[in-house]
């Protein structure tokens, strides 16, 4: 995540629409409490203007909300929701570290790991659960790699 700029989501004519925090409110999205680490690592480390987050799980507190594999115990819809919850957790950690999501310029990279069974090939549809949330909050022009 890149930090240190007050960039805002812009309309087609270049006028500001909303900051990330305003977009969350407009969308009716309440971030969860930041998850508790499962180990002795830091969930957020900032160096210069870059903020690195540990891999986020689809948890509430220390409770896993989605357990299983795509194509076995979980379907695409459940996995899509799991990716969204993990992204919400990441935003909660970023807000806790920075004080406001408005400090983020953009999300540079998004990694989504999906446990699957058999020859399932729908991982991109699962990752869209996180990507769609980030696009809603930061705008299409700020999609991560």
Model-found features: residue ranges?
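Short, polar/acidic, helix-capping and beta-turn segments at strand->helix junctions
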Residues: 2-145
